[in-house]
Amino acid sequence: MSAAPDVVIRTIEQGDLDRILEINEANVPEVGSVDVDRMSYLLAESPIALAVDLDGWTVGFCLVMPSDSAYDSVNYRWFTARYDDFMYLDRVAFEAEAQGHGLGTLLYAEVDRLMVERGDSHLALEVNVDPPNEPSLAFHARRGFLEVGQQDTPYGIRVSMQMRRAGSPG
């Protein structure tokens, strides 16, 4: 009988940059493509920046930014134009082999725990609806995210803008 996998969710460190970039680029177009300088900037803007390690190997990550960042994303700016107090899940990505095994649920639970600890009120994010990202839409619906609007992006993608209160069930 094999042992259960060892899952660790931890803060991203500078030495993780190449691996995080690799995972990010493997998930385009679900997440935007970035170069090393842009990823370094995103990490610096993210007070919650988490890596997911499975048996000692980084298989996923997420970056969460505050509502007072200078971040220039059109989706982030949609939220800042409408809300004063939120954290923005800029990107979450896993390598293909790690998807569908509950790691996203564990990662979101840790983001939620950290937000409650910090006193943050809501987590905001967007999910592609045209073309649809059905697995992501279902994942976020199960976690209590509610659509607060939609927008067409300059990249030809329509997104569902969603929010969830930190610490709420889901």
Task: Place the predicted regions along the sequence by residue.
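Conserved active-site alpha-helix within GNAT-family acetyltransferase domains
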Residues: 105, 130-149
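Active-site rim helix/loop that mediates acceptor-substrate recognition in acyltransferases
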Residues: 29-55, 63, 69
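A short, internal acetyl-CoA/4′-phosphopantetheine-binding micro-motif in the GNAT/acyltransferase core
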Residues: 90-99, 129-130
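Conserved acyl-donor/pantetheine-binding loop and adjacent beta-alpha core of acyl/acetyltransferases
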Residues: 63-91, 155
